[in-house]
């Protein structure tokens, strides 16, 4: 791992701590650098704003979904479910911070990250991310992330939502001739 990667990852970790403790919109890059004990000039050279840190965080969380690619299962639904749940489980320890980030930003500014996550879930499941599938999986992911934010306890509501939405996605894509 390079020094640049270490700096950005340390800043992401610090940003998560600060977001869990406060309001995301009120947190500055300077505060993140201070919390991470990184000179602001070094952080700024590698991540010039909080969006860059959110991109790195999203990539780290997507890696959890991609790690399920080695999970053997004949059923595509099960592979998609496992990948989506791996992403959710990676998010779970950071629930307070992620909720602060979501509430502290316009939801639309987070939207560009959703297709990347959808692609990671599809690819982890061995499903070619064609345009219709990517659009459908993005819609599934957005809804499931909303349910997760409101879910408490053992994630039963989240798991049920993922299961339902994946079944609906498969059925609708099949009707369009874009199924898997």
Positions of PLM-derived features:
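N-terminal intrinsically disordered/low-complexity leader segments
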Residues: 1-6, 179-180
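Helix-turn-helix
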Residues: 4, 10, 14, 18-56
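Solvent-exposed, amphipathic alpha-helical segments
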Residues: 10, 14-22, 64-68, 140-151
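Amphipathic alpha-helical interaction segments
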Residues: 10, 31, 82, 86, ...
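Alpha-helical DNA-contacting segments of helix-turn-helix folds
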Residues: 19, 47, 51-64, 98-101, ...
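Hydrophobic alpha-helical connector segments
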Residues: 67-104, 113
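Amphipathic alpha-helical packing segments from all-alpha helical-bundle domains
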Residues: 105-142, 160-161, 166
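C-terminal peripheral helix-coil segments that are non-catalytic and often amphipathic
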Residues: 150-180
């Amino acid at each position: 791992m390079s020094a640049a990667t270490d700096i950005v990852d340390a800043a992401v970790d610090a940003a998560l701590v600060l977001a869990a403790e406060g309001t995301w919109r009120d947190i500055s890059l300077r505060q993140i650098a201070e919390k991470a004990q990184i000179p602001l000039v070094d952080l700024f050279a590698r991540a010039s704003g909080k969006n860059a840190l959110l991109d790195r965080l999203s990539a780290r969380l997507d890696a959890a979904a991609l790690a399920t690619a080695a999970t053997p299962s004949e059923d595509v639904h099960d592979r998609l479910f496992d990948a989506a749940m791996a992403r959710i489980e990676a998010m779970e320890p950071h629930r307070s911070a992620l909720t602060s980030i979501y509430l502290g930003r316009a939801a639309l500014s987070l939207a560009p990250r959703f297709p990347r996550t959808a692609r990671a879930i599809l690819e982890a499941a061995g499903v070619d991310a064609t345009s219709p599938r990517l659009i459908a999986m993005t819609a599934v992911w957005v809804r499931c992330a909303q349910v997760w934010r409101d879910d408490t306890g053992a994630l039963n509501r989240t798991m049920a939502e993922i299961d339902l939405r994946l079944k609906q996605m498969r059925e609708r894509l099949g009707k369009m001739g874009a199924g898997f």
